[in-house]
């Protein structure tokens, strides 16, 4: 894996679905190294991951092996664009697609 998203745990779409279905808090970053907006958000999200106790998972939306599954996941949860920050817990899910989030905004969203 490249330096992009190195602070996150890579995960497959099928494993992400299993985590979403569990009651545990699950934090997922969907993005791609070639996306300029993802490149804007990723350093702040990485800092939050390093400074907090949260394990943030990552799906590279350019992964052609899982493209259909990624599109289905995005459609199901209304993830219109990347970068996307997705949080699920106890059957509830929320998503934000905003590359301008501050570290404080990110922490508020995932907490």
Name the predicted role of every residue range.
Residues 1-26, 105, 109-111:
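N-terminal leader/targeting and pre-domain segments
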Residues 42-45, 71-73, 100-101:
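Short, glycine/charged-enriched secondary-structure capping and boundary segments
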Residues 34, 62-63, 99:
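Short beta->alpha junction loops/turns
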Residues 36-37, 65, 94:
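Glycine-/small-residue-rich active-site loops that bind phosphorylated ligands and cofactors
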Residues 30, 53-69:
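Thiol-based oxidoreductase modules, predominantly thioredoxin-like and allied folds used
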Residues 64-82:
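Short Fe-S-cluster ligation motifs
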Residues 15-54:
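Local sequence-structure signature of Cys/Sec-based thiol-disulfide redox active-site neighborhoods
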Residues 81, 86-111:
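Non-catalytic, surface beta->alpha helical segment in thiol-disulfide oxidoreductase systems
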